[in-house]
Amino acid sequence: GSEMCIRDSFYFHRIMKAFLGEPVGTFIVRTRTEAAARLLRYSDMPIADIAYRIGYSSPSSLSKVFKQFYGISPLEYRNNKNFVIMKPAIIRPELELKHEIKEVPARNVIYLRLFGDYKLNDYCSAWMRLCQFIQEEKLPMGEVMPYCIYHDDPKVTPAEKLRTDVCMVLPSFATAKGDIGFKQLAAGRYAIFLYKGPYEHLQAVYDTIYGKYIPEMECSLRDESSAERYLNNPADTAPEELLTEIYLSLIHISE
């Protein structure tokens, strides 16, 4: 138990650094905003529909973030065909991601909430604390696959107020104690993408999900925190064999 936990905490730390210095939260927001830009340019979809499709609760939320990224409103961008977005998406149509839409049951988690810049959080210590808590409270060992939830949009929320929950999924209930919380993640419908390959290609994976898969799927993203699970350990796995699960919460268009 503890040896595996210690080993896995280092692996978790490596994963969080694998995004080439860009925190996951910023990365997801930027990718969503670029997806909006593509839909504005290449589709006739109304701006409100685009906002809901990529997971914003209102067109004004999308407009605010879009303006912060590009200095121009979604409507101005749609009407000004000469405006070029600096970072082109890396859509790889040949990238075959296994994906399924799945009803995920409720899950029990213990978690440590971190406040502050996603880049500066000490994920390693947080994971170690969860492992220590399990041993102290004599709880059954949870999943050794780290599960992280990012609650805030770093383009809208000041860095010091950003909230991250580092979670361990448990087989049973636990009682919160001190700064370690317990909660049940609600059951829900998710698009779950399974990517096999090196972490440095995750940007292309997200771009491909938002640019290719989401527009083709008959569903919309819920305005909710996304999550990731890391299924194996880079310390003893070849980069091309690494498995990453990406969870995106869904609503069906018929809802």
For each predicted feature, which ranges?
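Short, small-residue-biased leader/transition segments that mark boundaries at the very start
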Residues: 4-6, 255
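A solvent-exposed interaction/effector surface
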Residues: 10-18, 22-30, 34-41, 45-48, ...
